Amino acid sequence: MKFNRIFLIVCDSMGIGNAKDAKKYNDFGANTVGHICSICDGLNIPTLQNLGFGNLGDFKGVAKTQNPQAYILKLNEASNGKDTMTGHWEMMGLKTEKPFITFTDTGFPKEFIDLFEKKTGRKCVGNIACSGTKILDMYGEHQIKTGDWIVYTSADSVFQIAANEDIIPLEELYHACQIAREIAMDDKWKVGRVIARPYIGTKEGHFTRTSNRHDYALAPFSKTALDSLKDAGLDVIGVGKIPDIFVDQGITRKIKTVSNEDGMNKTIELASDNFNGLAFINLVDFDAVYG
């Protein structure tokens, strides 16, 4: 069967239960959708239910169906890793054998932080594995007073830099991320991504991350299906952070989004566009706003 257009939509970080290797990453029991359903006393998602979403697990309020209107299945990663790049690259046929370096338990080495501070002219606070919302409550007011960078990591291979847009200009934040990316090209610190995490707000409990996030990723180490599609003369439209994840490799057109709703509205608009190929969409709010 041949399709002129394919829409691949990734609900970033919206998991339906832990994977087979969850214990390896201390993620056993993870189930974002299941927990949302429980806290909200069930979800009313009739369209997804008819497609067969309820058949993927036990989700309160979402019934299973005997005749789903779509093909449904669960996937487990074959790659060695669990971060954004590893997962998205594997979707496009690129299996990662050697996981990216993580600093979850230790934070980044002093040598790395010292070099970053010297090159950017600002001190750092944080340097721990932490939720992106929690770290702002911990250090947001401190940054307003001092102008220090808030840096942190996670279970993923990332160096994240948070900056209040009213204190540190966006361009300075982006430049600092480029500096961090250059430093982190050293094999001993080679993380998968450096991420700019701008936010606004003035006091604990009222900080909000903005849509001006930007990822500085390593390029895929080999060709992906995106390259094959592009080389075949087909359209490859990256929506949201997809172009960042692949460092524009194999992408023919980029569409920026500011939220999940904006991402879906732009995807709906694309349905009226007479392109021929793939629209690859990432809905990032589950991670960027709530992660």
What residues fall within each predicted segment?
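Active-site nucleophile/metal-coordination loop of metallo-enzymes that catalyze phosphate/sulfate
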Residues: S13-G147, Y152-N164, I168, R197, ...
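Gly/Ser/Thr-rich active-site loops/lids in small-molecule metabolic enzymes
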Residues: C37, L173-C177, N260
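Anion-binding catalytic surfaces of enzymes that hydrolyze or transfer phosphate/sulfate esters
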Residues: K145-T153, S157-V158, A184, K188-G291
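Structural signal for hydrophobic packing residues in well-ordered secondary-structure cores
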Residues: C40, L56, T120, Q143, ...
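Charged, low-complexity intrinsically disordered tails and linkers
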Residues: Q160-V191
